[in-house]
């Protein structure tokens, strides 16, 4: 996991190359690349977006030139149009920053010797939230559906619902 100015970035690095979960801000793309490059000689092959917020997707236009971007269909829809989050307006991302693979409920990527399962959990933090399960490593990346030490921000303006976020947490504890 890489940590920085935005959300945490999950990394799978190995013989197949590199997969990252979320990519933070475009001005940080070179620093993000410098952090994962020593982990594998292979290329960046996948970027998984856990939701559409700028601190998780705004380096997509940089990394989308070399890797497949994968996200829930609502993430692509929201990144394709002007959006508002906490009073800030964000312009649509250019084509190279949009997810090219989308899903409605779940998608699996078989990469670096394990199944990486991406599951949409509707209406928690936003209406495009996904949780990423690294099945062999027994690791979960929850995007902004989990905040260490405090309750997550629920973006009701963009489809988030407190009760659904609670339901997600409850389902993962089983």
What are these regions (language model features)?
Residues 28, 32, 59, 75-78, ...:
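Stable alpha-helical elements in mature extracytoplasmic
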Residues 75-121, 126-127, 135-136, 167:
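Metallo-beta-lactamase
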Residues 15-19, 27-70:
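Active-site metal-binding motif and surrounding structural segment of the metallo-beta-lactamase
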Residues 28, 52-58, 76-79, 126-129, ...:
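Active-site environment of divalent metal-dependent phosphoester hydrolases
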Residues 21-23, 45-53, 70-74, 121, ...:
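Active-site neighborhood of phospho(di)ester-bond hydrolases with catalytic His/Asp-centered motifs
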Residues 23, 27, 149-174:
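Cap/insert and terminal regions of metallo-dependent hydrolase folds
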Residues 1-35, 130-144:
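Conserved beta-strand hairpin/beta-sheet module of binuclear metal-dependent hydrolase folds
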Residues 12, 22, 36, 51, ...:
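Divalent metal-coordination and catalytic microenvironments
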């Amino acid at each position: 996991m890489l940590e920085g100015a935005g959300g945490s970035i999950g990394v799978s690095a190995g013989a197949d190359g590199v997969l990252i979960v979320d990519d933070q801000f475009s001005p940080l793309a070179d620093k993000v690349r410098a952090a994962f490059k020593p982990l594998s000689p292979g290329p960046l092959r996948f970027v998984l977006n856990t939701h559409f917020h700028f601190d998780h997707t705004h380096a997509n236009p940089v990394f989308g030139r070399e890797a497949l971007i994968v996200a829930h269909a609502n993430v692509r829809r929201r990144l394709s149009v002007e959006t508002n989050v906490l009073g800030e307006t964000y312009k649509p991302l250019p084509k190279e920053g949009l997810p090219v693979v989308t899903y409605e409920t779940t998608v699996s990527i078989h990469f670096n010797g394990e199944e990486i399962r991406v599951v949409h959990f509707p209406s928690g933090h936003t209406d495009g939230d996904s949780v990423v399960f690294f099945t062999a490593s027994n690791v979960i990346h929850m995007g902004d559906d989990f905040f260490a030490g405090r309750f997550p921000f629920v973006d009701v303006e963009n489809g988030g619902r407190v009760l659904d976020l609670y339901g997600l947490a409850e389902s993962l504890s089983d």
